[in-house]
Amino acid sequence: MVLDVTWAVRWLTLCAQAMAENRVWLIELDRAIGDSDHGENMDRGFQAVLEKLAEARPETPGAALKLTAMTLMSKVGGAAGPLYGTAFLRASTALGDAAEIDPGRLADALVAARDGIVARGKAESGDKTMVDAWTPAAEAAQAAAADGAGTVLGVLVAAAEAAEAGAVATEPLVARKGRASYLGERSAGHRDPGAASSALILRAAVGAAA
C-alpha cells in the first residue's frame, strides 16, 4: 500500500464520514463533562475540509493536511479547532512535499501531531484529554516503524489501536485540563470526547489504507 495524496484525501473523507456518523455520540460524551458541542463542531469542520479539498485539489499528502489544518482552525469552535489544526499542521510539516510516505516519515508525522497538541494545549498524559489518545498512538507508531519489517499499514494499525485503548482509558481519570477539570472528581467515569474523536481520526487513516 502506497500512502500518497489519494490516500490522504480518502483518509480525510473517511474522517468526515466518521464525524457525521458519530456526531450524536460525541455530543453525548461532551455533554457529560464539557459543553455539548464537540460532535457538532467536528462534523461541521470536516465537512468544510471536504469542500476545501474539492476546490484546491492538493498534490501531496502534506498539502492536503495543511489545508485541513487551516480549515479546522477556522471552522471548529472551542479548544478542538486550534488543537486539531496544530496537529495537522505539524504533521504536514513533517511530511514536507513528499509524494509518498514511508513508515518512518509516517511515524514522524504522528509524533509531530502529538507534540503540536501538547504544545498548544499544555496537557500531559493522564490529564484526561486527547493527549491520552495521541501519546500512545505516537509511541506505537514509532515502535512499528522501527521494526525492520514495518509497513505503513502496520504503523497506522498500531497507532489506531493504541489511540482507541488510550481513549477508553480516559474513562476512570479525573480531568486536570480543559472544561472537564471544573467538575473535579465528577469527571471520572466518562470518556474524554477529544480522545474519542482522535481515535476515530486514526481509525479512518487505517480504513483509507486498507
Where do the PLM segments sit?
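N-terminal loops that bind phosphate or other acidic moieties
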Residues: 1-210
